[in-house]
């Protein structure tokens, strides 16, 4: 093979490994110890992956083609190669790992230990390099600011959000929210944090510049939240309402309540086709909703007790 051909071939391989034509959904099935992989182009399950015991949280790393799964009962993190959909490593954490988040540079994995009340920061390139921080009571949802400088932690039993410097791993401030904050999302510019308050039946919108917040009532026992990429709409799963609430962020009002499967938990917005994916714990499925019409498109059978807590959508890379 000629040098030019070798270089061209190598470039094609590199492009194929770093660009994903379709978006993929990674759904943890806590009762089956598996992860269902859904291709959003045809909304079909294309793989079923055996992971650790009691999988709950998900974080995706597109550039490195990795998916991280927290196994709350197995006290571990399963690491999946998204190119092959095979588990390539199992990282023992101890405790009870639940929430996960990846830094924007994809160099650090953050893990919320639900029962031991601490956050674990793991160097992805050297997984034995780990730092610990006590952030609050029963930490659940995690998310990192787009600039990578701040980690936000929903402390369920402290009823607050801990804001942590990722450089020092020190808490810089706390923001009180509703009762039992759990799922988190953030606007693409990092200016607003969205917090689900389970026992308050509400979502808090926190201005990350000054800490001021605004609360919007939603359905019964909300759990997780996902914002549209243009920052105009917010979607909240209501576990005991078997529905999601669609919120207009300009008017700060619920504009639609959309029926889903039983006990919806994890929720994610697919950017290209503008579809919403909701994991239903109660009937082992994922509901797919058209964001342009707020209508249910289909329900996809997955596995026992589907949760998909966190950022479980591997968005298409163009």
Predicted regions and their residues:
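Predominantly soluble domains enriched in secretory-pathway, periplasmic, or organellar proteins
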Residues: 5, 11-318
């Amino acid at each position: 093979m000629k040098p030019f051909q070798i270089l061209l071939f190598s470039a094609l391989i590199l492009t194929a490994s770093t660009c994903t034509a379709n978006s993929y959904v990674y759904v943890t099935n806590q009762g089956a110890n598996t992860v269902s992989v859904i291709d959003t182009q045809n909304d079909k399950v294309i793989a079923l992956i055996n992971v650790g015991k009691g999988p709950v949280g998900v974080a995706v790393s597109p550039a490195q083609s990795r998916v991280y799964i927290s196994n709350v009962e197995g006290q571990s993190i399963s690491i999946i190669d998204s190119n092959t959909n095979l588990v390539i490593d199992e990282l023992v954490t101890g405790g009870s790992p639940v929430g996960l988040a990846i830094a924007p540079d994809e160099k650090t994995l953050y893990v919320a230990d639900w029962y031991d009340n601490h956050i674990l920061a793991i160097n992805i390139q050297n997984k034995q390099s780990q730092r610990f921080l006590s952030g609050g009571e029963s930490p659940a949802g995690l998310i990192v600011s787009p600039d990578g400088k701040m980690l936000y932690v929903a402390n369920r039993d402290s009823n607050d959000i801990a804001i942590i410097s990722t450089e020092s791993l020190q808490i810089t401030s706390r923001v009180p929210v509703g009762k039992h904050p759990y799922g988190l999302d953030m606007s693409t510019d990092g200016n607003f944090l969205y917090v689900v308050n389970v026992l308050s039946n509400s979502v808090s919108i926190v201005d990350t510049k000054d800490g001021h917040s605004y609360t919007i009532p939603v359905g019964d026992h909300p759990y997780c939240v996902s914002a549209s990429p243009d920052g105009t709409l917010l979607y909240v799963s209501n576990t005991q309402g078997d529905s999601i609430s669609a919120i207009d962020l300009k008017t700060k009002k619920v504009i639609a309540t959309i029926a889903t499967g039983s006990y919806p938990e994890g929720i994610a917005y697919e950017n290209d086709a503008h579809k919403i994916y909701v994991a239903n714990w109660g009937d082992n499925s994922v509901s797919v909703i058209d964001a342009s019409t707020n209508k249910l498109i289909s329900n996809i059978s997955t596995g026992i007790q589907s949760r998909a807590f966190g950022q479980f959508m591997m968005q298409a890379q163009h």
